[in-house]
A protein has these predicted regions:
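Membrane-anchoring hydrophobic helices of lipid-metabolizing enzymes
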Residues: 2-88, 93-119, 123-126, 194, ...
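Non-catalytic C-terminal accessory region of glycerolipid acyltransferases
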Residues: 2-37, 130-275
Length: 275
């Protein structure tokens, strides 16, 4: 086929995709105002991820078409990769995912309504179990703010002895799906590892540390195999099992230590690490 023919096919595909997206948004607003708002933001985030990070997601088929699952992920300095993941879920799967966020976000003026619209909860186990028993997906990062601030380009998991998320999965009788995004630490980096900011967080639990970045590095999100519900496993055992699964994704898909220049060049790499 000629170059002109290829360009025509590409433009036709883009026009078709744009038409379908517009129809989806129109239908969403007709059905529900908040649903329309969610899909509009999802479309914007999806476009941003594609343009700025060449965002890819591998293993999306492991997310159930319906029914609950607990998605456990590594927390970057700014979890922008998680927003791209949520957008992809809405657009490609037609599903929303409830998310657990640190309580300090709910104290930001004017932010609470936005969090409620996007089904963000501050994490009591009972509320998490309720969301899963109602058939929703639920995303949580056991490392939370601590991992966001104090982890670095060597990608250590800072979960401590946290096992509440595992107890939630057991009580809800749902599978756990591990998730990790390649180069998320190269997109944004935190200076929380510096002794002063570490002391502030450890002593006063103040999530205050300079963050720099916004670099257009390659982002690839990888979903691991679901860990099925096991009635005979303890929360501590499941927590360890999930941590090993997330660590396995890091080992397989992330070059350690992370490097910003290399992550930028990976925008031009056809095959991800581990493939």
């Amino acid at each position: 086929m000629s170059n002109t023919g290829n360009q025509s096919c590409l433009m036709g595909a883009e026009d078709t995709l744009s038409f379908l997206r517009k129809n989806q948004l129109r239908e969403a607003y007709c059905n529900n105002l908040w649903d329309g708002a969610r899909k509009t933001l999802a479309t914007l985030w999806d476009g941003h991820g594609a343009i700025w990070h060449g965002y890819e997601i591998h293993g999306l088929e492991k997310i159930p078409v319906e029914g609950p699952a607990l998605i456990v992920y590594y927390h970057g300095a700014i979890p922008i990769d998680y927003y791209y993941f949520l957008a992809t879920l809405i657009i490609q799967k037609g599903r929303t995912c409830h998310s657990v966020a640190d309580h300090f976000l709910f104290k930001i003026p004017g932010f609470k309504l936005l969090l409620e619209v996007f089904s963000v909860i501050h994490g009591p186990q009972e509320e998490c179990v309720r969301a899963l028993r109602n058939g929703h997906l639920l995303g949580i990062s056991p490392g939370g703010v601590r991992e966001a601030l104090l982890s670095d380009e060597t990608y250590p998991l800072l979960w401590g002895k946290r096992k509440g998320f595992a107890q939630v999965a057991i009580d809800s009788q749902v599978p756990v799906i591990p998730m990790f995004t390649q180069n998320v630490r190269e997109g944004f980096r935190s200076l929380g590892t510096l002794s002063f900011f570490r002391w502030l967080y450890e002593r006063f639990r103040l999530p205050v540390a300079p963050i720099y970045g916004g670099f257009p590095v390659k982002f690839r999100t990888f979903l691991g195999d679901p860990i099925p519900y096991d009635p005979n496993i303890t929360a501590a055992e499941l927590s360890e099992k999930v941590q090993q699964a997330v660590q396995s994704l890091i080992n397989q898909h992330q070059r350690i230590p992370g490097n910003i220049l290399r992550a930028l060049l990976e925008r031009f790499q056809l095959k991800p690490k581990g493939h």
